[in-house]
Curated annotation (Swiss-Prot):
InterPro entries xrefs: UPF0154
Organism: Malacoplasma penetrans (strain HF-2) (Mycoplasma penetrans)
Primary subcellular site in the record, as a coarse category: membrane
Protein's recorded name: UPF0154 protein MYPE400
Lineage of producing organism: Bacteria, Bacillati, Mycoplasmatota, Mycoplasmoidales, Mycoplasmoidaceae
This protein's GO CC annotations: membrane
Membrane protein topology class: Single-pass membrane protein
Length: 75
């Protein structure tokens, strides 16, 4: 009887930890991708500032093109 309980605990706890780690990793990845999509690492105003620091005036087309590239790479 005591051997059966010990065996159940000895196998159940590590298996539960492994399953929990896999599920946690999956949901953390989904959450991270969602946050990147909602809050990109760079904004249009940052792109404009970068162009101005280089001494150039960006067109709206260039800014949209750079933002589209960032969104495409984040998928």
């Amino acid at each position: 009887m005591a051997l059966a309980i010990g065996l159940c605990l000895g196998l159940g706890i590590p298996i539960s930890l492994i399953i929990g780690a896999v599920i946690g990793y999956y949901f953390a990845g989904k959450y991270f991708k969602k946050q990147l999509k909602e809050n990109p690492p760079i904004t249009e105003s940052q792109i404009r500032a970068m162009y101005q620091q280089m001494g150039r005036k960006p067109t709206e087309k260039q800014i949209k093109q750079i933002m589209a590239t960032f969104k495409k790479n984040n998928k």
